[in-house]
A protein has these predicted regions:
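Alpha-helical support elements that line or immediately flank enzyme active sites
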Residues: 12-31, 126-150, 290-314
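Internal helix-turn-beta structural module
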Residues: 46, 318, 325-430
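Glycine-rich, mobile lid/loop segments that gate access to catalytic sites or pores
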Residues: 6, 66, 73-257, 388, ...
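N-terminal, positively charged regions that mediate nucleic acid binding
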Residues: 1-40, 45, 421, 427-430
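Short, charge-patterned binding micro-sites
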Residues: 39-59, 327-331
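A structural-propensity feature for long, helix-poor, extended segments
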Residues: 48-50, 154-179, 313-351
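Conserved phosphate/anionic-ligand binding catalytic regions in large, soluble enzymes, centered on
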Residues: 8-10, 14-19, 115-130, 256-281, ...
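C-terminal catalytic subdomain
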Residues: 271, 276-320, 331-338
């Protein structure tokens, strides 16, 4: 019997994602000026206010207020009508030094013996539902909002009422064997201007205006947004969006008040959006604002790198990898692999895990080096998912008061590279 499964995403203007992006932009500035920085930066955003807190050990000095305002401005909160404006919001910092007790567990005389920054469990996942080896429900949810943001920033004339905050949700019908059959429901809630005014001050007139706005936005989503998004996908995904697919746009009828004015945002509150959309387990640790000594982040990236390369190598059609660490200890405490019955090799999942341990050095320092994590690469991860993204090289610029602009050529999303496929095929005899 077929079943339904759903994932959601949120836009870069969602309050929790505003917080994530500020935290990661601050991290990037520290990493750009001192790649050995230890950073844990949390952000709270609400009506007209940004609060920064956390712990830092670094030789760099960064302008926290300027960074926060730049991020808010780039996202699109640049009007007083939003009640959260880059140029007028308050920015309060309570960032202080890193605990010496934590630092002693991380730093070692021999860098390769660097201990994990905390205990914890981290998961990585990959499957064959999409070219990016991500769950279709989440991949589509991200793609819808990425394209909506691009329209808002680059082709606003197509949907001139758009504001930064938005959410999406995609439900897919799967076969009993777990294969996507069709897209059952798409939900899009997008913040918008109050662009149709009521004829008079009555509630009836307001209801008519609200209904007309909702109808206009729904038509534009159907006519402008959806064709652009589905054009990115293979034909089987395009066919999955059929005449029976339900489209729900702004189901409450109106979404004018949004962003940090509508809901307070906090760093680390969208961890399922950031990872696998509920299709795989999550260890509970958030990513944004954390330097790679925090295995919550670096080991989760390593686990995705392993899972993706295993699937791409043909070891299995679906792979879940769990890693576990103890604070101050370099080697992982455990490595677990689950292929959910999709393995193409004559080995148990435990034997696959043993080979993974032999192929991949999973000490924190080795992960940092292999994935090039001691670089300012994190702001780009903080919206539209940390996984399923395209690896690419870019040049990033960071403004400083003392050194002018500092340029870094960096490689983004290195954990998405399929650079271990040949090695794995050889080790597994494929």
């Amino acid at each position: 019997m077929s079943y339904l499964f759903t994932s959601e995403s949120v836009s870069e203007g969602h309050p929790d994602k505003v917080a994530d992006q500020i935290s990661d932009a601050i991290l990037d500035h520290f990493m750009a000026l001192d790649p050995h920085s230890k950073v844990a930066c949390e952000t709270l955003v609400t009506t007209g206010q940004v609060v920064l807190a956390g712990e830092v050990k670094s030789d760099a000095y960064v302008e926290l207020q300027d960074i926060a305002r730049d991020v808010i401005r780039e996202i699109g909160y640049n009007k007083s009508a939003y009640c959260f404006d880059a140029d007028s919001c308050g920015v309060l910092s309570a960032i202080h030094g890193q605990s010496a007790d934590i630092n002693r567990g991380v730093e070692r005389t021999a860098p390769e013996e660097q201990g994990a920054g905390d205990q914890g469990i981290m998961f990585g996942y990959a499957c064959r539902e999409t070219p990016s080896l991500m769950p279709l429900t989440l991949d589509l949810s991200h793609a819808l909002l990425e394209e909506l943001a691009r329209i808002r920033k680059e082709e606003l004339h197509l949907m001139p009422y758009l504001r930064p905050d938005a959410k999406s949700q995609v439900t897919v019908e799967y076969s009993e064997e777990g294969k996507p059959l069709r897209i059952d429901t798409i939900v899009i809630s997008t913040q918008h201007d109050d662009f149709i005014q009521p004829a008079d001050a009555t509630a009836e007139a307001q209801a008519i205006a609200d209904t007309e706005m909702q109808a206009r936005i729904t038509e534009d989503i159907r006519r402008v947004l959806l064709p652009r998004v589905f054009a990115r996908y293979p034909e089987d995904v395009q066919r999955a969006f059929d005449s029976e697919t339900k489209l729900l746009v702004n189901p409450t009828g109106k979404f004018v008040i949004g962003g940090p004015h509508g809901d307070t945002g906090l760093t680390g509150r969208k961890i399922i959006v950031d990872t696998y959309g509920g299709k795989a387990a999550h260890g509970g640790g958030a990513f944004s604002g954390k330097d790679p000594s925090k295995v919550d982040r670096s080991a989760a990236y390593a686990a995705r790198h392993i899972a993706k390369n295993l699937v791409a190598a043909g070891v299995a059609d679906e792979v879940l990898v769990q890693l576990a660490y103890a604070i101050g200890v370099a080697e992982p405490i455990s490595i677990f692999v689950n292929t959910n019955g999709t393995s193409h090799v004559s080995l148990s999942d435990a034997e696959i895990a043993k080979l993974v341990d032999e192929v991949f050095d999973l000490r924190p320092y080795a992960i940092e080096q292999r994935l090039k994590l001691r670089a300012p690469i994190y702001r780009e991860t903080a919206s539209y998912g940390h996984f399923g993204r395209e690896p690419r090289k870019v040049t990033k610029y960071f403004s400083t008061n003392s050194r002018g602009d500092v340029a870094h050529e960096v490689e983004l999303f290195t954990w998405e590279k399929l650079d271990y496929v040949d090695t794995l095929r050889q080790r597994f005899g494929l």
